Amino acid sequence: MKNIIFMGPPGAGKGTQAKILCERLSIPQISTGDILREAVKNQTAMGIEAKRYMDAGDLVPDSVVIGIIKDRIREADCKNGFLLDGFPRTVEQAEALDTLLKNEGKSIDKAINLQVPDAELLKRLLGRAEIEGRADDNEVTIKNRLDNYNKKTLPLLDFYATRKKLSQVNGVGSLEEVTSLIQKELA
């Protein structure tokens, strides 16, 4: 079984690499944003609760997100593992996730962090903004997003490092080079 967490700053290539990895390992990619929207659409108990916060423009509390993740990992396609993308983002969320998984007889096998220098991230994100025509992705807002990410994520990296679950992977290189490095960490 492979229960994996994918971490990395905006522009590191998480989404692209997660998709490839999930196909190769035959495990589902669980994106918290996607499962929140799905739970709301399906009007599950947790989805109805999440909708109250989303409609008010508030962040969905960790307890609700954890409840939705709990429902998702109980689905049949997760029996051989899963890849969590975009969660946890804080140590508190990681602790709650560990408790949830322990209660389900599971645990995180590996937390993969894609490392990409800020200058490269800036280049990628500005390029992506140009292609997608996103006016909000200018140099100032991108640097702010990266600063926020770095402040919030460093304690999370320590959390998984102290548990001997963290693998730091160089996210600079060709698609195949980075994929190969990730697969070596999972072997």
UniProtKB/Swiss-Prot annotation:
Binding-site list for AMP: 32, 37, 58-60, 86-89, 93, 134, 145
Source species, domain of life: Bacteria
Reactions catalysed, as given in the entry: AMP + ATP = 2 ADP
Gene Ontology annotations for the cellular component aspect, listed alphabetically: cytoplasm; cytosol
Range of residues in the leader sequence: none
A single GO molecular function term of this UniProt record: nucleoside diphosphate kinase activity
Keyword terms, alphabetized: ATP-binding, Cytoplasm, Kinase, Nucleotide biosynthesis, Nucleotide-binding, Transferase
Subcellular location: Cytoplasm
EC number: 2.7.4.3
Residues holding ATP: 11-16, 128, 173
Primary location group: cytoplasm
A Gene Ontology BP annotation from the UniProt entry: nucleoside diphosphate metabolic process
One Pfam entry name: ADK
Start and end residues of each stretch annotated as NMP: 31-60
Domain remarks in the Swiss-Prot or TrEMBL record: Consists of three domains, a large central CORE domain and two small peripheral domains, NMPbind and LID, which undergo movements during catalysis. The LID domain closes over the site of phosphoryl transfer upon ATP binding. Assembling and dissambling the active center during each catalytic cycle provides an effective means to prevent ATP hydrolysis.
Family: Belongs to the adenylate kinase family.
HAMAP family: Adenylate_kinase_Adk (MF_00235)
Assembly, per entry: Monomer.
Protein name: Adenylate kinase
Species per Swiss-Prot/TrEMBL record: Leptospira interrogans serogroup Icterohaemorrhagiae serovar Lai (strain 56601)
Lineage per the UniProt record: Bacteria, Pseudomonadati, Spirochaetota, Spirochaetia, Leptospirales
